[in-house]
Amino acid sequence: MPNPKNLPTYYDEFVESAKKTKKSYALSTLNIFTYRYRLAESFDGMIAPEVGRTLTGYNVLTKVFLAYTAYESIVKVSRQLRVKNVNQFELNVIWNSELAIRLRKNEKLKTYLLSRKNDSGLDTKLKNFFDGSTSDIICVAYALRNVFAHGDLTASSVGTETIAKRKIFTALANTILDYCDDRFTDCLDKL
């Protein structure tokens, strides 16, 4: 649970630990993480009146994108600090069976992500996710991040047209941010 400034829960403790640590190599990445986290946690949407209802879909996808950038930073620094149970990006997982079930019900999302050409590792993870073999939700966020940042993703192509569907994407972003907040706390124990 973030603090009122939308920074990680133990941000104040981080500031104090940063003054004392001998592991200065990790401080830069932890700082980057805290501000990426704050942006993702604080993000409430863009203002573009002429775009119309499509903007609400882009807003939830942007929140997932921002949460994933925070995730990238925390995984990197967690690995540097040798935090337990954090693997390299292609092997790291975030399990959430309830959210996985909700994501799998979005047929547009499934069709869109499975039709994209990704690296073979991500393709395999997505197939396993959508066939119910795994509840690792981070592969969905990673695929969304890729097509959002580098591809031809539109908000309607992944099923963001209803409030209920948009709430699932918000839940995906929030689950990633919760994971990040927990790993940040683990990192503090290693400083």
Predicted regions span which residues?
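Short, solvent-exposed loop/turn segments at secondary-structure junctions
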Residues: 76, 153-155
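Extended intrinsically disordered or low-complexity regions, especially N/C-terminal cytosolic tails and loops
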Residues: 1-90
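Short acidic, glycine/Ser/Thr-rich loop/turn "cap" segments at secondary-structure junctions
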Residues: 51-55, 124-129, 156
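Long, hydrophilic "mature protein body" segments
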Residues: 1-2, 124, 130, 143
